[in-house]
Amino acid sequence: MQATASKGAQRERSGQARARAIVRFNGLLFHSLAAASFLETAVPLHVNRLNQVFAACSDVVLWLEQVWWPQRAEHGRRLRDYLEATWPEFNWNAAYQEFYDSYRPRSGLAGRGAGAALEALGLCVTAAQAAVFYRALANCADEPALRALARRAACDHGGCFDYFSALFERCKHDERVGLMTSWRTVRAACRSARDFDASAAFEPLGRHWGGTPTVPELGYGEFRARMVPLIQRHAALGRIERLLFRPWLESDRSAPAPQLPEKRPERRTLLAPQPVAA
C-alpha cells in the first residue's frame, strides 16, 4: 500500500514536471505572464494619484491602500516567482526596470482631470479586462500551479470590478455623468490598456535574456493576434465583456503617448481615466 502511494506521488510529480516543461517553451504564455507581472507590480505608480481623485471618500482611500494595492502587489510577486522558476534565463529585474523607467513618466496622464465617477469607471474596465485575461489563462493552462495562480487573480480582479462598479454608481449622480460620456470613457480606457499599458509592458521582454531565449520572440501585433482568440475560446465572454474586448480586435494603430488634458471645463467629463492594466 505504501509502495502504491509512493508510485502515485512519483507519477504526479513527473506529470507536473512535464506540464512545467510544456509551459517553459510556450512563447504566448511567457509574454502574457511577464507583461502581467510588470503591470501588477507597478500599481504604486497609480495609488497617489487615485488617493487625490478620491480624497473626499476616506473609505475609498482606505480600501485602495489596505486592499487593492496589497492584493495587486501580491499577484505581481506570485507572477514574478513563477516566471523566475520557469524561465531562470530571463532577467526579470532588468526587464522590469526598463519597463518602469518608460512607464513611470506617462502612467496616469490620460486620467488627470477626470472626476471620481469616470476614474471609477475606468478602473472597472481595467479590472474586468484583467479578470477575463486570468480566467482564460486558468481555463487553458495545463499546469496545476499556473491554474491556481490564474484563478486566484481572476477572482480578486472580479472582486475589484464589483467594488469599482458600486463606486461608479455612487459617484455618477453627483457628477451627472451621462450615457455617452460613460461610453466614451469605456472605449478610451479599453484602447489605453491595449495601446499603452500592455504595449509598454511587452516592449522590453525580448532584450533581457542570459543566453538564447527559450521562447520565440513575438512582436506586439502577433501577440495580440494570438491572444485574442485564446481569450475568446477560453474565457466564456459575456455580452458586456465582448464589448470591452472589441477594441482589441481592431486593426493596429500607432497610438500617441498620453497627453495632459486641455483646460476646457466643458469637455472635462469626456476625458477617460488612465486604467491600471493586468
List each model region and its residues.
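Non-heme di-metal
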Residues: 1-278
